[in-house]
């Protein structure tokens, strides 16, 4: 069993701050200034920030430059986002910044913090929103093997992460391949170089919207999905709400999609179409989710790629110009322009997509296996 030490004994923990937004002279300078919103699940080394402040803003706010190699940890909701600074920069108050001594390797610390996201969240304090104080972070215990072993452990995680990122890039390439094939077969949706039939969305699909009021949620029952449950590009039942069988049966047709229908996000991340696959259990939908039920003159693969095409979003922006929040409204969605190729052409495209999806599935299975390996390594080294 490795010795456990306090983070405060092997790191200097420093908080960030925000210059006054009302003082223009503090902003749009050359000083990199990062916020937690800029980090995601794959963040590792960070070399730039979205916002920059001036040297005057930094000094007047009392901000210190965080040195290269500093491990940054988001300490406000969401707690637990982490990265390593690849260059000198400043941070806002949403971070606790850990400057490592020579007793701890920063990449080892990075992987430890990623493994402990749930634990760190449990340490959050606050009535309005949870936050990790400097003292809480300093008192977190970490296993501390010899520095050579820390490097070895970090290298193991880096190898697995590199494989995962390579596989994810392969998935992105498959998606780009489908987009390219779509353009190759059907041309640009706006200029229509192949003189395909032009129609409206209502010519090829019926449009439905989910339940407009919030139902009564229960612990078990029929799944009831909102936009968060499909925005990843797949149907995710892991954190969805449930309603009773009785309430499900009383839902209007618009809130009861069926296998083969195509779900889409109406708010937030617009579009993100998902075709409901075979063997999916029955579920209801909230108004943030809509769905298309195709007609005989279109197949779902073509319809899905049409919604993922840039021309679709251009039509969205044309209809919501000036709106503070984008909502897909059936009043104008039904009139969206869509090219209608022959079913022979559409089916040719569908065959290509099906073959690509098989390849994607194999890659996704590899990613799942690598993620499980990473979890086992986290358990082995960090408990």
Which sequence ranges carry the predicted segments?
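Low-complexity, Lys/Gly-biased intrinsically disordered segments
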Residues: 1-42, 59-61, 194-235, 248-252
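Non-catalytic DNA-recognition/assembly elements of restriction-modification systems
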Residues: 1-17, 139-154, 166, 170-211, ...
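A short beta-sheet element
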Residues: 35-36, 50-114, 226, 246-248, ...
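Active-site/binding-pocket entry motifs
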Residues: 39-40, 78-79, 119, 230-233, ...
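Short glycine-enriched, charge-decorated loop/helix-capping segments at active-site entrances
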Residues: 49-53, 158, 240-243, 354
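Feature detects amphipathic, helix-rich regulatory segments
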Residues: 61-66, 72-73, 88, 134, ...
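Residue-level recognition of specific faces of alpha-helices
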Residues: 94, 128-131, 136, 156-159, ...
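Specificity-determining recognition surfaces
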Residues: 96, 114-142, 306-338
């Amino acid at each position: 069993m490795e010795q456990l030490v306090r983070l405060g004994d092997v790191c200097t923990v420093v908080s960030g701050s925000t210059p006054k937004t009302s003082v223009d002279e503090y902003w749009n300078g050359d000083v990199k200034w990062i916020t937690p919103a800029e980090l995601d699940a794959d963040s590792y080394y960070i070399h730039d920030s979205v916002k920059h402040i001036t040297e005057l803003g930094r000094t007047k706010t009392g901000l210190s430059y965080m040195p290269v190699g500093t491990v940054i940890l988001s300490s406000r909701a969401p707690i637990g986002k982490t990265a390593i600074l690849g260059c000198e920069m400043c941070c806002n108050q949403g971070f606790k910044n850990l400057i490592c001594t020579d007793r701890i390797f920063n990449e080892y610390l990075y992987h430890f913090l990623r493994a402990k996201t749930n634990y760190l969240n449990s340490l959050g304090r606050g009535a309005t929103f949870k936050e990790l104080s400097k003292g809480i972070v300093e008192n977190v215990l970490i296993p501390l093997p010899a520095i050579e072993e820390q490097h070895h452990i970090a290298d193991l995680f880096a190898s697995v992460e590199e494989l995962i990122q390579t596989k994810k890039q392969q998935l992105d390439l498959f998606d780009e391949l489908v987009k390219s094939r779509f353009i190759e077969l059907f041309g640009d949706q706006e200029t229509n170089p192949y003189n395909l039939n032009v129609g409206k969305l209502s010519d090829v699909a019926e449009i439905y919207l989910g339940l407009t009021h919030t139902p009564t949620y229960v612990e078990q029952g029929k799944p009831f999905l909102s936009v968060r449950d499909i925005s990843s590009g797949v149907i995710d039942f892991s954190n969805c709400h449930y309603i009773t069988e009785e309430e499900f049966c009383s839902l209007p047709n618009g809130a009861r999609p069926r296998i083969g229908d195509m779900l889409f996000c109406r708010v937030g991340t617009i579009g993100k179409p998902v075709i409901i696959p075979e063997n999916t259990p029955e579920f209801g939908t909230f108004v943030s989710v809509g769905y298309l039920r195709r007609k005989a003159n279109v197949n779902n693969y073509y319809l899905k790629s049409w919604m993922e095409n840039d021309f679709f979003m251009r039509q969205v922006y044309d209809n919501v110009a000036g709106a503070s929040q984008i909502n897909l409204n059936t009043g104008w969605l039904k009139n969206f322009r869509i090219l209608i190729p022959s079913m022979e052409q559409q089916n040719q495209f569908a065959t290509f997509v099906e073959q690509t999806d098989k390849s994607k599935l194999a890659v996704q299975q590899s990613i799942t296996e690598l993620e499980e390996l990473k979890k086992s390594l986290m358990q082995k080294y960090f408990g």
